[in-house]
Swiss-Prot record:
Listed GO CC annotations: membrane
Gene giving rise to this polypeptide: abcB2
UniProt organism field: Dictyostelium discoideum (Social amoeba)
Protein's name according to its UniProt entry: ABC transporter B family member 2
InterPro entries assigned: AAA+_ATPase (IPR003593), ABC1_TM_dom (IPR011527), ABC1_TM_sf (IPR036640), ABC_transporter-like_ATP-bd (IPR003439), ABC_transporter-like_CS (IPR017871), P-loop_NTPase (IPR027417), Type_1_exporter (IPR039421)
One Gene Ontology term from the biological process aspect of the record: transmembrane transport
Length: 1397
């Protein structure tokens, strides 16, 4: 793995305070941009070595099925630096990773694909650090030293405890010169020294590893996006791009977790394990061997759990990948979903995709519970054996070689603590191993893309530069070509075409003939399988890819704009363009006037995928973008298709001027626009069947003549042949279109509600709502969500809660009970009577056995039950969130903060974060509460004075936790917003990859992505330092409390605070019995037993409080997650509580017994909510009689589409009413209303799935016969049947299997199948070729009979037979009548007609 893949150059200076935060970004231009330099040298020669990710897409079926509940989550508990003996904190780190699903027709599995039952592929562990720079390596080395040193602290404590206990031996206590207080104080000082070391080491461990991980993850994100952007378009055809953008967030997060502070935590506990056993063997190898014999059982239980959890987590990630794909697709196509009232079905479908994860989550809880239960069973069993055997060593007076004396109680304590803590540390390290496994699995998929040699690499510096030499001679020589997604279907076979420089060549022919493939090959979106494409005699493969594309200007049928200002979108064509150049280009494209009319002019944000612009406005911006490029070669794929006749004529003239002196390839269905071309090539079946000028071809009386004659017959009353300035736009691929690879916003109807100038601003919600939302997002932590409301969602799981509560309560009591047993053992080891020592040690061993069984059962019950509750809660939150998203009005989706990328990312993460309040954390919280209460009760009963002194220190620990929690709350929100913005940049770039490639703006996208990462980079420094300091402070505080406890406890023992039991004194001290056990007088004997009893009680208080403090500490460790959970809960419930003005889930409103279709717009006043002062309609009135065909005509931006928008109730008018059959549509049931309307938009949006499933989306219960009948009516049946899988052909998420015309016909079939009472046709035939258009138009005319039809048209020839033609201008009806009457008036309509003559 080459170091070139690393990106970033560092300011390698220490200390950390001098770190240059911006250094990471300075690296970007060097390493990220050079990451693939060596790879680029072989890109064109290693095509066969490039494996595309492929996976079969699942069909969405069984629409009426009820689905189960589900949720997978990440358990990410941060282990604390444990006290003496902490409960094992073994939890599995999972993740909401998103797996890339890819469309495939070849049915191959990706080389890294996991077979059933196998562990997913992973990279070697050290490969995780491929993005590390020297400074990161230095940080990791220092962090490693700190972690290893931190791990030594607990074994060191065991030595101190052993020494302290041995100081209480009968020999010392019998010595009159023995100073108890001084002895205890001197030993307690060691805790101060260790505590100071722990503070420094904890800070270094956490801060350095966290910072190093964040820095490397930033580079990984940048490298991953760059690798995605460098792939050839064919790779996108077989890779589901709707999940690629999510993977940038999810997989890189798993990657970051595997290289951050979890490594420090793992090294810390590994060090404790090793040092613990070293101390054990040095201080007593016999007992150590006995304990060590059982240690592998603990490791085996941990390994078993880790493997099972990793495998189940991988499966859960796959399940969520499918759910994420559904959510992104449906949110991005919300207008299509709303049109067909598909919201309830989509909620069910989303739930269905989570069904598999329900079983996985349940199994995960079971396996986790079994694994941890086994660990505790073995652990307490080891305690039992240890103390029994330790007592035996003391009784038998076995010789301990290192201190060179018989075994004493302190030796047992030292060995026991050190070895057990070492074993426990091994268990605590195991969750990190699961994180490493998840990170290595995520890295495999990331590296798979990063290391893939793109067949056509846009970042390659190889090849000739042609900027100064290009002339424009183009030759296609013996081309053979098939699309990667359909290698079995030949597009070209020995295709040949020569285009001379400075000439215009038009490609014409029926849809699906292969015209757009010509452009795709010239742009090098694809390379031919056979033959070559030449530019000025040079094979284009030998030309630098950026140099080639910089000299080509492409304007396609479906323009893609990015969520930026108009000026920035145009600047994609020329990064160095001045504002004057941008304005000039817009004037040429006839866009300047409408842009200048906007309040913010060229700084107006266009919205995601240009959603705020009408179709015509988007097209003009796209033309300006191409013009400012000043290309030597122009590729026009129906470049004026979305313009009205007035704008089309002006822009066409501008384009014709631009074409002068340039080589131009024009794809056209409308032959009147290309009759002046130097050459016209008729493409049919992937071959050129005729070529020549218009007169030459027309004289042949062949295919071209037939095409011309068909269009003349369909002209304006049979008038002249130049009358068709229409909106026929098409992608003519037989199985691919060269438009955007994955248009995630709703293309079929996105222009509806955006046709007027009033739509050209971001956000279509009312100002008050917007202000509230912004206020809420600024400081979401100020608003709290009652925990009761969250738990209320789990009220159906109360049996699990009650059972889990019992388990958590038992679990919480275990460690306080352990403190009692342990303090008794300390007294036992000071027992002088060997028979009594043997008996009591055997009894304590049995107590430990009982404790082991209870701990195993309690842990299983607690973990399983609360995991189950958490899974169900997160399912409910995800379902409710998605349902709330689906119920929102269309304007809500137009807000930038509600973009597809952000909503899907939040949907995937916020519900998981809320689980921080429930699931295992809730169980642990209950357990800790019981531990705290029980520990305090025991402590107060055993010694209230010492307890009060120690409790006075607890607020200090609480303060440290509060500081950390407050910090994480602020960071969580800021980091979330920053990464959401980064995700949106990536999502847009991937979704519009063909536009990104065509305009060579990959580096611009990367720079924008880098800028988005600036904030997380800067915050990472503060985050790592505050985390390290607060963690170190909270841990060292424990050691200072140890010091205070022992010092004050020693004073209390010395003062006789805990007198010995009277029965003990009667047995061993009174009546001369003291002599039998070696004491010289009764007073010394009494003092010795009183001191021993006092020491035992002091340790009981100490351990009880430590257990409580550890409970507090562990709860504090949850504070960052709790802070994130609170923020996420606020966001989720804000979404769930939002009342939609137009709610598709409301089953209220009346339905009419008979739907006739009389429609009336009465005194309509309407402004888009974001522009209340700019009226679209002011007193708009229109009556549409039932059964009539009404055409809306006029210039682009006049408000025509707003009529359909209001009728579909995408928006509500601010004043006036819209009635159907005399009933206000607000009073009608929304789904019933939309169910009686069929809408076909200009730009069709289909869903991933089969053609059959797309058609029945209009009528879910349709039969196959109905589907076929609808397809026949839309002239789609024949081409569908010609496909290998016919109606079961998978479309994927980019629909590359269909041409633009074919997509439109499927969309028309989808509308026809519902047998609507009202037809809404917004240029429904615009994407069809002449033959298909004519047939479909006849079909639409037939189905329109007896129905109310509203047709929006720029091409007037399609509406001359309308019963009523309505001329809409600036939001007003200026003329009304039939074609003949309006012509006779010689008004605005007559002017429109004359323009098209």
């Amino acid at each position: 793995m080459s170091d070139k893949s690393n990106d970033g150059g560092e300011n390698d200076s220490l200390p950390m305070d001098n770190i240059n935060i911006n250094s990471i970004d300075d690296e970007n231009n060097n390493d990220i941009n050079n990451q693939d330099d060596n790879e680029n040298n072989n890109n064109n020669n290693n095509n066969k070595n490039s494996d595309d990710n492929e996976e079969n897409l699942k069909d969405y079926k069984n629409k009426k099925e009820d689905f189960g509940n589900i949720k997978m989550d990440t358990i990410d508990d941060r282990p604390t630096n444990n006290g003496i003996l902490s409960p094992i904190d073994i939890t599995s780190d999972g993740g909401d990773s998103v797996k890339t699903l890819s469309t495939t027709q070849s049915k191959k599995l990706d080389e890294g694909e996991k077979k059933e039952g196998e562990v997913g592929p992973q990279v070697p562990f050290f490969s995780l650090f491929r993005f590390a720079k020297p400074f990161d390596i230095l940080l990791m080395i220092i962090g490693t030293i700190g972690a290893l040193a931190n791990g030594v602290s607990m074994p060191a404590i065991s030595i101190v405890f052993g020494r302290l206990m041995n100081s209480f031996s009968p020999e010392n206590l019998a010595d009159p010169n023995f100073d108890l207080v001084e002895t205890v104080t001197s030993n307690a000082m060691y805790f101060i020294y260790i505590g100071c070391g722990v503070f420094v080491c904890s800070y270094v461990e956490v801060a350095f590893w966290m910072l190093a991980g964040e820095r490397q993850a930033v580079r990984c994100r940048k490298a991953y996006l760059k690798a995605i952007l460098k792939q050839e378009i064919g790779w996108y055809d077989v890779t589901k791009s709707s999940e690629l953008s999510t993977r940038i967030s999810s997989d890189t997060l798993l990657f970051q977790e595997a290289i951050g502070e979890k490594i420090g935590n793992f090294l810390h506990h590994t060090s404790t394990f090793i040092c613990g056993f070293i101390v054990g063997f040095v201080n007593g190898w016999q007992l150590t061997l006995v304990i060590f014999a059982l240690t592998p059982l603990i490791a085996a239980a941990g390994a078993f759990m880790t493997k099972m959890m990793a495998d189940l987590t991988k499966k859960g990630q796959d399940a969520y990948a499918k759910a994420g794909g559904v959510a992104e697709e449906k949110i991005g196509s919300i207008r299509t979903v709303s049109t067909f009232s598909g919201e309830p079905f989509e909620v069910k479908r989303y739930t269905e995709r989570l069904k598999e994860a329900l079983d996985i989550g349940t199994k995960k809880g079971i396996m986790n519970g079994i694994g941890i239960g086994l660990v505790f069973l073995v652990l307490f069993g080891t305690y039992s054996l240890s103390f029994w055997y330790g007592g035996k060593l003391i009784v038998d007076r076995k010789w301990n070689p290192v201190p060179d004396r018989p075994w004493q109680g302190g030796d047992v304590l030292t060995v026991f603590f050190s070895v057990i803590m070492g074993a426990m540390a091994l268990g605590q390290a195991s969750p990190n191993v699961a994180s490493f496994a998840n990170g290595r699995g995520a890295a495999f998929k990331i590296y798979e893309v990063v290391d893939r040699n793109s067949k056509i690499d846009p970042f390659s510096t190889e090849g000739r530069s042609i900027e100064e030499t290009v002339q424009g001679n183009i030759e296609y020589r013996n081309i053979g070509f098939s699309y990667p997604s359909r290698p079995d279907v030949k597009i070209f076979n020995n295709f040949n075409l020569t285009i001379k420089k400075g000439t215009t060549v038009a490609l014409v022919g029926d849809s699906g003939g292969g015209k757009s493939s010509v452009i795709g090959l010239l742009e090098r979106f694809y390379d031919p399988d056979e033959g070559e494409v030449y530019l000025d005699g040079t094979n284009i493969k030998e030309i630098n890819i950026h140099s080639l594309r910089r000299n080509i200007g492409l304007v396609s049928q479906e323009p893609v704009l990015f969520a930026n200002s108009i000026a920035e979108n145009i600047r994609y064509g020329n990064e160095n363009a001045t504002m004057d150049q941008i304005i000039e280009a817009c004037k040429t494209a006839n866009a300047h006037d409408f842009i200048s009319a906007l309040p913010e002019g060229y700084d107006t944000q266009v919205g995601e995928k240009g959603v705020q612009m009408s179709g015509g406005q988007k097209q003009r911006i796209a033309i300006a973008r191409a013009m400012i490029k000043d290309p030597k070669i122009l590729l026009l794929d129906e470049a004026t298709s979305a313009l009205d006749s007035q704008n089309e004529l002006l822009v066409q003239q501008s384009i014709e001027k631009l074409m002068i002196g340039r080589t131009t390839i024009v794809i056209a269905h409308r032959l009147s626009t290309i009759q002046d071309a130097d050459q016209i090539a008729v493409v049919k079946g992937g071959a050129i069947v005729e070529i020549g000028t218009h007169p030459e071809l027309y004289a042949l009386n062949g295919v071209y003549t037939q095409l011309v004659n068909r269009q003349q017959k369909g002209g304006d009353d049979g008038d002249k042949k130049k009358k068709k300035k229409s909106k026929e736009s098409s992608k003519d691929e037989s199985n691919n279109n060269i438009g955007p690879s994955s248009i995630s916003i709703d293309k079929s109807i996105q222009s509806i509600g955006a046709d007027s100038l009033e739509t050209s601003t971001i956000g279509l919600v009312n100002d008050n709502d917007n202000k509230k939302k912004k206020k809420k997002e600024k400081k979401p932590q100020e608003k709290s969500v009652p925990i009761g409301r969250i738990l209320k969602l789990s009220r159906g799981d109360w049996p699990h809660f009650l059972i889990g509560l019992v388990g958590a309560t038992l679990n919480g009591a275990i460690m306080p009970v352990f403190s009692i047993i342990f303090s008794e053992i300390l007294g036992i080891f000071q027992e002088q009577d060997t028979d009594e020592l043997t008996r009591r040690s055997r009894n304590m061993a049995l107590w430990f056995i009982l404790l082991a069984v209870v701990a195993a059962l309690a842990n299983f019950i607690q973990i399983y039950c609360f995991t189950f509750i958490g899974e169900k809660l997160t399912f409910n939150l995800r379902r409710l969130s998605f349902e709330s998203i689906m119920r929102q009005d269309i304007g809500w989706f137009d807000l930038t903060e509600n973009s597809t990328g952000r909503l899907t990312a939040n949907l995937a993460t916020e519900a998981t974060l809320v689980q921080g309040m429930t699931s295992q954390r809730l169980g642990l919280l209950i357990q800790n509460i019981v531990t705290i209460v029980a520990g305090l009760v025991i402590a107060f009963v055993s010694g209230w004075k010492l307890t009060l002194v120690v409790l006075a220190c607890v607020p200090v620990i609480g303060f440290a936790g509060k500081v950390e929690m407050d910090f994480f709350q602020g960071f969580s929100q800021k980091g979330k917003e920053a990464y959401a913005e980064c995700g949106q940049v990536a999502s847009e770039a991937i979704g519009g990859i063909r536009t990104v490639s065509s305009f060579t703006c990959e580096n611009k996208i990367l720079e924008k992505f880098r800028q988005c990462l600036q904030k997380p980079i800067q915050m990472s420094f503060r985050k790592s330092n505050v985390s390290g300091l607060s963690f170190g402070f909270s841990q060292c505080t424990l050691f200072f409390i140890y010091t205070l406890t022992y010092w004050y406890g020693g004073k209390l023992v010395d003062s006789g605070e805990w007198p010995a039991k009277e029965s003990t004194l009667e047995t061993y001290c009174y009546n001369g019995e003291y002599a039998n056990i070696g004491y010289t007088d009764e007073a010394t004997c009494i003092k010795s037993f009183t001191t021993t009893e006092g020491f035992s009680m002091m340790m009981r208080v100490f351990f009880a409080i430590i257990m409580s403090a550890m409970g507090v500490g562990q709860s504090m460790a949850f504070m960052p997650d709790l802070g994130k959970a609170k923020l996420a809960a606020v966001a989720i419930f804000s979404l769930i509580d939002r009342v939609s003005e137009i709610d598709p889930f409301e089953n209220k409103g009346q339905t009419l017994p008979e739907f006739k279709g009389d429609i009336e717009f009465k005194d309509i006043k309407f402004s888009y909510p974001s522009r209340p002062n700019k009226a679209v309609f002011q007193g708009f009135n229109l009556v549409i009689p039932h059964g009539k065909k009404v055409a809306l005509v006029g210039n682009s931006g006049g408000g025509k589409s707003s009529v359909i928008s209001l009728l579909e109730r995408f928006y509500n008018p601010s004043q006036g009413s819209i009635t159907i059959d005399g009933v206000n549509i607000k009073d009608l049931n929304l789904n019933w209303l939309r169910g009686n309307m069929g809408l076909v938009g200009q730009e069709p949006f289909l869903f991933s799935g089969t053609i059959f499933e797309n058609i029945i989306y209009g009528k879910p219960d349709a039969t196959m016969d109905e589907v076929v009948e609808a397809a026949k009516a839309a002239n789609a049946h024949t081409f569908i049947e010609s496909l290998p899988d016919a109606y079961h052909t998978q479309l994927g998420d980019k629909f590359t299997q269909l041409s633009g015309g074919q997509k439109q016909r499927v969309a028309i079939a989808r509308a026809i199948i519902r047998n609507p009472k009202v037809l809404l046709l917004d240029e429904a035939t615009s994407a069809l070729d002449t033959v298909s258009e004519k047939v479909v138009q006849v079909a639409l005319d037939n189905v329109s009979k007896g129905r109310t039809s509203i047709v929006i048209a720029h091409r007037l020839s399609t509406v001359i037979d309308a019963d009523l033609i309505v001329v809409v201008k600036e939001g007003k009806v200026v003329e009304l009548g039939t074609h003949e009457t309006l012509l006779a008036e010689n008004g605005f309509y007559a002017e429109l007609v004359s323009r098209q003559m």
